Amino acid sequence: MLQETHLRTNDLYRLKVKGWKQFFPANRQEKKARVAISISHKIDFQRRNIRREPEGHFIILKGRIHQEDINIVNIYAPNMGAPRYIKKILEDFKKDIDSNTIIVGEFNTPLSIMERSSKQNINKDIVSLKNTLDEMDFTDILRGFFIPKKQNTHSFQGYMYHFQR
């Protein structure tokens, strides 16, 4: 998953030469930062449907990998109002989210205590977003399995969620 990409046409050619044959940008404007999903040629992926936001803040890719349906969502939340933005996306696409959904991205929101400085407050929008994620039964794969304790993660607020039923 790529965040804040500024890829030009010749950059896409270089990606394809290096084995990233399937590339799905959220928008086509070269000047704007956008998110994208790139899939290796080694993976048998068949695209079914793709939904993009015109500003390039998110992309939802539906397809099949080895005869298994999968949804991949890449979100780049704006700096202001990020919790409400993410919550709205999740609620708008709630019917499309199933047990084979992976959500990745830059949420620009400290959802975990490990990502906050001691002076940072948790506001009601963050609490509401966390409640929505809990209600939808998401698992934070990155924090749950790969970063077990508070580390110097600087300002990294990327997330990877997997929906389980």
Go through each PLM region and give its residues.
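A shared catalytic/ligand-binding motif for oxyanion handling
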Residues: M1-R165
